[in-house]
Amino acid sequence: MISISLCMIVKNEEKVIERCLRSVKNLVDEIIIVDTGSTDKTKEIVHRYTNNVYDFKWRDDFSKARNFSFSKATKEYILWLDADDVILKKDREMFISLKKTLDTNIDIVMMKYNTAYDKNGNPTFSYNRERLVKNNNKYKWVSPVHEVIVPTGNILYSNIAISHKSVKKEYSKRNLNIFKKMINNGIKLDARQQYYYARELYYHGMYEDSIKEYRDFLNMDEAWIENKIDACIEISRCFYNINDYKNQIRFLLKSLEYDAPRANICCEVANYFIQKEKYDIAIYWYNAAINLKQDINSGRFENLECYDYIPYLGLCLCYDKIGNYKKAMKYNELLGKIRPDDEKYLYNKAYFDNLKNSIL
C-alpha cells in the first residue's frame, strides 16, 4: 500500500475546510496545510486534523504556495485539494482500493474534477486533473494563476472524482488582477496563461477585451487544440452578448478547423439556429451531439449535459415548433428518464398531456 500526503493551501476557508478534511482524513497518512494569511477560524479548525500547519506570505502566486506545501510532504505520493473540494463516499471507496493496489511505477493519477451539478447532485461539468503525484521532487507547479503540474511519466486515468462544492456567491477578480499585474510587470503570457486571461475577461463581462485576447491566443502555435476549441465557444458567446450574431456562428464553425465537432459545439450551433427559427437545422446539430461519445481521457472541459439533457430538451422544443408532437413527446420522455424530477420535463409533460386532451 502506498503512503499519501495531502497538501493544501488555504486562506479564510472556515466555511468549508472542515467538510473537506472530514471527507479525506481516513484516506491519507499525512496532512499538510499552508495558510496564506487567514484572519478567520481556518487555522483553528485545521489544527483539529493536523499539526503540520505552516504560514506562507502571499505573493500573488499560487504555484509558489503550492510548491511550498509540496516541499513539506514526507510520504510516497502527494494528493492536493482545494478547501471547497470534497471526496464523496463512493469515491472514497475507490480511493481506498487505489491506495491498496497502485503500482508504484505510476507517476501521476488523473482523477475527474466535477465542478457543476444538477439539482439532484449529479455532475454536469467535469474534466481530469493531475490529482495524485509521486513525491520525487520531479513534479512542480507552474504559473502564478490557474496553476498546473505538467503531466509526464507513467499516467493512470482513474474513475475517482473530486467534487468541487463552492459556497462563494460572486466570482472573484483575484485571478484577473494577478494576470494584469503580470502583464504590467512585463511578463509575456504563455499560451495557457493567455487562454485563461481571456477567459477571466469573459467571466467579468469584458467581452470586447476578451475577444481580442482570445484571438491573440488562437494565433499561438503552441496552444492546445482543446483550449482553441473552447476559445471559439467563448468568443462566440462574447459576440452573442454584444449582439453580433454573424460572428457568433462564425466562431462556432471556426472550431471545426481544429478537430471534429464536440458535443458542446453541436449544442451551441443548434441553439444559434433555434434563435433563427431554423428548427430543421437545429435538429441536425442536436442529433449530432447525441451521437458523440465522451472521451474521458482527453483532458478537455466536458459539459456532460451536452450528450443528452440539452439535446433532448432542444429536440423536444424543435419538434414541437414544427408540429411533430409525437417526436417532441418522445424526446421529452427521454428527458424524463434521465431526470424524472426535472422542472422542464414536468412542465413539458403537462403541456403535452393538455395538448392530447385538446386534440381528443
PLM features per residue range, with description:
Residues 7-30:
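Short, well-formed alpha-helical segments that are part of the catalytic scaffolds
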Residues 15-18, 40-49, 90:
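Acidic helix N-cap motif at the loop->helix transition within catalytic regions
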Residues 23, 35-45, 58, 82:
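A conserved acidic beta->alpha catalytic loop
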Residues 44-68, 72:
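Conserved donor nucleotide-binding strand/loop of the catalytic core
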Residues 64-70, 81, 87-216, 222:
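Catalytic-site signature of metal-activated, phosphate-bearing donor transferases
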Residues 78:
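Short aromatic/hydrophobic "clamp" motif used to bind/position activated sugar donors
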